[in-house]
């Protein structure tokens, strides 16, 4: 089943050219997401839409328009940014996630059809999280996801937090983060989280091409209840509580 683990390509939005929202949008439209799910995850996952809220979250917004590969839209946004072509480095290592280098090369191939030239820089696995993530302008990354929307947003998207790996700072998003956290009406909170997901999808600095399935194997000697959690691996990390020897 598909959980909240997702693979990402965060851009530092306080650095050129990623500080231009049109450059970010061009890169969003330059990616064939389904191809990445098919070839990197072998079909064991689902396409992402550039926000981190997954199918195991309560307030996943399912009505946000899906971003798909569109060379014309990518070129439109490059032109809006004053560019006829775009040349960018993408740092990657399989330390980021299994298949990250291959995923980056797939991205490179699809983006080329939109006039975007991605130079894939294969970084050493040793020291990747110290020397590349949060340091290089654009890189490969992954997140295991979080059990609640507020937890996910507060960890990686709140302004000023250490793990905001895009340095994206949107005033409306930050306002909604605080109001949704305090909102007791579930319908109002759902609407607030939906707007936050839309803002990230359309303007944010993270490309999120795919969410991964949780694939577990178990002996027939083990038994479990009717449902299996998909927030994290191993029955949402509660295998020792909810499984038993048959």
Residue map of PLM features:
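Periplasmic-binding protein-like
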Residues: 2-3, 14, 18-57, 99-103, ...
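Short, solvent-exposed loop/beta-turn-alpha elements that line the ligand-binding surface or hinge
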Residues: 1, 10-20, 54-73, 130-135, ...
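Solvent-exposed, polar/charged alpha-helical surfaces in well-ordered, non-transmembrane soluble domains
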Residues: 9, 16, 21, 25, ...
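Structural transition elements
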Residues: 47-80, 96-102
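Loop/turn elements at helix/coil->beta-strand transitions in domains of secreted/extracellular proteins
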Residues: 20-24, 32-36, 83-89, 114-117, ...
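Bilobed periplasmic-binding protein-like "clamshell/Venus-flytrap" ligand-binding domains
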Residues: 38, 81-98, 139-144, 184-220
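Periplasmic binding protein-like
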Residues: 90, 103, 108-160, 192-193
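Structural recognition of the beta-strand scaffold that forms the well-ordered cores
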Residues: 1, 7-10, 29-30, 37-38, ...
């Amino acid at each position: 089943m598909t959980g909240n683990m997702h693979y990402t390509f965060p851009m530092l939005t306080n650095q050129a050219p990623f500080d231009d929202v049109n450059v970010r949008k061009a890169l969003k439209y330059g990616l064939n997401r389904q191809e990445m799910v098919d070839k990197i995850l072998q079909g064991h996952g689902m396409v992402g839409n550039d926000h981190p809220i997954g199918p195991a979250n309560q307030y996943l917004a399912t009505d946000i328009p899906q971003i798909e590969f569109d060379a014309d839209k990518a070129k439109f946004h490059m032109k809006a940014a004053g560019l006829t072509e775009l040349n960018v480095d993408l740092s990657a290592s399989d330390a980021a996630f299994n298949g990250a280098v291959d995923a980056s090369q797939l991205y490179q191939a699809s983006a080329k059809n939109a006039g975007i030239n991605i130079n894939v820089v294969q970084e050493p696995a040793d020291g990747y999280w110290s020397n590349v993530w949060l340091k290089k302008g654009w890189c490969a990354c992954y997140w295991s996801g979080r059990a609640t929307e507020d937890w996910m947003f507060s960890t990686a998207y709140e302004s000023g937090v250490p793990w905001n790996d895009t340095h994206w700072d949107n005033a409306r998003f930050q306002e909604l983060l605080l109001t949704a956290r305090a909102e007791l009406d579930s319908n109002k909170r759902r609407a607030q989280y939906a707007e936050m997901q839309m803002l990230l999808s359309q303007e944010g600095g993270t490309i999120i091409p795919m969410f991964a399935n949780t694939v577990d194997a178990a002996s027939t000697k083990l038994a479990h209840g009717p449902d299996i959690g998909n927030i994290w691996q191993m029955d949402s990390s509660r295998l020792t509580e909810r499984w038993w020897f048959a």
